[in-house]
């Protein structure tokens, strides 16, 4: 995770130092514009050498929770402005403990498995949607939908579909390997992956025009792999869903039964790739299959098998980013990557503007973020069409006084509005200047 984040920050031209005790791991980054330092992240000497006394952010994402927390505490004491630690103790996420950790010098805690489980359950709640992103508890919603021949709005110019009074905007289209930030002359085609921005009450309408009404709502779920992500997902699925976890390790099955004893989750000892086992466990009457083993290839193949057996909704955890493209080409469905989910959470701490809910969308090499417009910021001075936004940046909607609304060229953004920004191949540091107080043109 640290390596992925360091590469991301290097790409964004952030000065970055990566600390690791493993010299071989550091040598793998020789081709990147990243300064590496061999040493312990809990060594004051090493932290000083890395520049912790003047750093904007220290990120502790080793597999060792205690080491991450200690590194953050030490870096804060040395003068680092913000710190974030990766944890695996769910207790630490309790809201009442936030001031406690803040007093220790730890600004933010991330539990990647919890973040991934949230994405998984968002996908399970809407079987026809591959990605969902909510602003202000769903006042504004972005939906990523794979379009098929049943879609009513194919092969029509968007200017005929997405007028000022229409209940949705299309902020991006993925067509093959190409990402399109659409204009009025662009059209949607069969097999496109489209991102719709809408408000909560119009989600059923989007489902209808996309031709997805025949998708059965998810009631029965099979999860393959009984790791931490599976546990967090099973603990947070809606009560109306029946969840089965298939785990190959017998001792882990015993542990899962202990962890999930207060839920209705059924734990099954077996290989989730075994077709006879899947048939025995009712895969023909299962609406969603979630593959969460630690092996990307296994997860992809398992989802392909589930699809052949009639499961419409499949979700695969793909930690190896090299396999994400292949998973998309194979039409796996929803792809979960803990590295990008956690990196998005961390990256927003580097932005000076008031930004939250930042997400990286692997499928379209883009970011989507919720910015709050500051008093006197550039984005509040003119209608959207006159702002001179960078190419690849789209404002999809905003939330004002708790009410979601779409944005068009004539819209005027007010101070305090929460604004959804879709940003393709753009440095978010360039985007945030529009939302900061006393922004300069």
Where are these regions (language model features)?
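Cytosolic regulatory regions of ion transport systems
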Residues: 1-441
């Amino acid at each position: 995770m640290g390596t992925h984040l360091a590469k991301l920050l290097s790409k964004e031209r952030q000065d970055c130092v990566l600390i690791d005790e493993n010299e071989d791991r550091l040598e793998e980054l020789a081709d990147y514009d990243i300064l590496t330092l061999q040493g312990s992240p809990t060594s004051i000497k090493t932290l000083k050498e890395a520049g912790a006394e003047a750093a904007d952010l220290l990120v502790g994402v080793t597999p060792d929770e205690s080491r991450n927390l200690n590194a953050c505490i030490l870096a804060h004491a040395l003068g680092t402005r913000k710190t974030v630690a990766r944890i695996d103790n769910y207790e630490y996420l309790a809201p009442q403990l936030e001031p406690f950790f803040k007093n220790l010098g730890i600004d933010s805690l991330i539990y990647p498995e919890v973040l991934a489980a949230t994405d998984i359950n968002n996908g399970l709640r809407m079987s026809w949607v591959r990605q969902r992103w909510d602003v202000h508890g769903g006042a504004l919603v972005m939906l990523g939908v794979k379009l098929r021949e049943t879609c009513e709005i194919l092969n029509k110019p968007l200017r005929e579909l997405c007028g000022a009074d229409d209940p949705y905007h299309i902020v991006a289209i993925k067509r093959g390997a190409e990402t399109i930030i659409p204009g009025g002359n662009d059209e949607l085609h069969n097999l496109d992956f489209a991102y719709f921005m809408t408000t909560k009450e119009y989600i059923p309408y989007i489902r209808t025009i996309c031709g997805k009404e025949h998708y059965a709502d998810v009631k029965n779920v099979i999860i393959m792999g009984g790791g931490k992500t599976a546990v967090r997902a099973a603990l947070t699925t809606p009560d109306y869903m029946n969840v089965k976890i298939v785990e190959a390790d017998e001792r882990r099955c015993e542990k899962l039964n202990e962890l999930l004893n207060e839920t209705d989750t059924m734990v099954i000892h077996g290989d989730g790739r075994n077709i006879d086992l899947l048939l025995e466990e009712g895969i023909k009457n299962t609406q969603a299959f979630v593959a969460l083993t630690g092996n990307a290839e296994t997860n992809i193949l398992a989802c392909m098998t589930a699809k052949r057996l009639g499961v419409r909704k499949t979700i695969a955890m793909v930690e190896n980013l090299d396999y994400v493209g292949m998973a998309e080409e194979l039409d796996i469905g929803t792809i979960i990557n803990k590295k990008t989910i956690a990196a998005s959470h961390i990256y927003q701490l580097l932005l000076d503007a008031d930004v939250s809910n930042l997400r990286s969308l692997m499928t379209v090499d883009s970011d989507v973020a919720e910015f709050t417009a500051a008093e006197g910021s550039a984005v509040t001075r003119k209608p959207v069409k006159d702002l001179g936004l960078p190419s690849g940046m789209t404002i999809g909607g905003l939330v004002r006084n708790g009410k979601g609304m779409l944005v068009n060229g004539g819209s005027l953004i007010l101070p305090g509005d929460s604004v959804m920004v879709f940003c393709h191949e753009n440095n978010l540091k360039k985007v945030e200047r529009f939302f900061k107080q006393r922004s300069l043109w």
